[in-house]
Amino acid sequence: MECGQSFVIAKMNTRNVDFVSIFYPQRKSNLRGDTMKKLSFLSALCGAAMGFGAVASANAATTLEAVKAKGFVQCGVSQGLPGFSNADDSGKWTGLDVDLCRAVAAAVFGDAEKVKYSPLSAKQRFTALSSGEIDILSRNTTWTMTRDTQLGLNFAGVNYYDGQGMMVPTALGVKSATELDGANICTNTGTTTELNITDYFRTNGMSFNLVAFEKADEVVAAYDAGRCDVYTTDRSGLAAQRGKLTQPDSHVVLPEIISKEPLGPVVRQGDDQWFNIVRWSLNAMINAEELGISSSNVNMKKFQSNLAPSVARLIGKEGKFGEELGLSNDWAYNIIMQVGNYGESYEKHVGLNTPLKLARGVNSLWSKGGILYAAPIR
């Protein structure tokens, strides 16, 4: 109940309230003095409470201020998904999602290495973000209406367009997902995958038995041990986890794509500045690829005099777009120089020359037949 509501209810529940004097103060009131004192006290109490709340709100540090104070960005990532967020034996994190965290650090600090990583299960990720344990969630997370409107979170964009698929052992002899009636299916808890697979089997009049685990490695181990006939997750995830199987070549991804999975970074609601920083860090990487600006030529462009206006704005030679974010005007230059453009990140971590061998497909630029499109910096 709101403070103002309490005050109104208190007035309505107080005996001998003179409604004539309330609505017509120029007329003489017969309201007893002690009742008026009670109402005055309640009014003062509410005012003090509201004032205290306003002061507390005004003194609360923004995410950017908190990040600068501690000296790094705390980024929530997966517990190990090659190509997207995965740590090597030395503890170094790499991947498409990791590069987004590094881009934010480059924008804020001018140093892409000022990031610390929190490996999170699908079940843990939203709680970790809501509680303030992490500053940004960049963990192959699907943007859905419920997540966007009911959890107090904001999706800052899409850094990978995906769809859910299914992998089966070649020995099963299955060519299509429509042949999987009665199958045992392995997947992760706390994901859209569970809902999508239920919808697909129900729509196609088939039954199945779901075997769900919290950790991705548990799912892979169960499937590899033969506890399930099918492993289902995003198709990029299947490509990433396939390499962990005892005999990767003895498994095939079926042709059906049963859902839309727009994956992207997530932040808490209520801090538009931080939301903008994360969103425009991603936009800068996409715009850089479209404009032909990469980590190998951005430094040369910085000292070039006859730049196209769109390039000059992107790398901070024209306008004050960094200041609008609360950053230095070379924020995007730092991202491109230290992390690269979107295409560089894609090809380095998940492209055709990596173990995942993922073609760009819909993740190509809009000008090259894909749907990747960033708002302009101007």
Protein language model regions, located:
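Acidic, polar ligand-binding/catalytic clefts
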Residues: 102, 106, 110, 114-179, ...
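Short helix-initiation/N-cap motifs at beta->coil->alpha
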Residues: 115-127, 210-225
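Sec/Tat signal peptide C-region and signal peptidase I cleavage site
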Residues: 34-35, 54-60
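Short, Lys/Arg-enriched N-terminal segments with co-localized hydrophobic residues
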Residues: 9-35
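Bacterial N-terminal signal peptides
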Residues: 43-53
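Extended ligand-binding regions for polar small-molecule ligands
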Residues: 99-102, 106-108, 171-174, 178, ...
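Extracytoplasmic small-molecule ligand-binding "clamshell" domains
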Residues: 60-138, 321, 327, 342, ...
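Bilobed "Venus flytrap"/periplasmic-binding protein-like clamshell domains
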Residues: 74-83, 93-108, 142, 162-214, ...
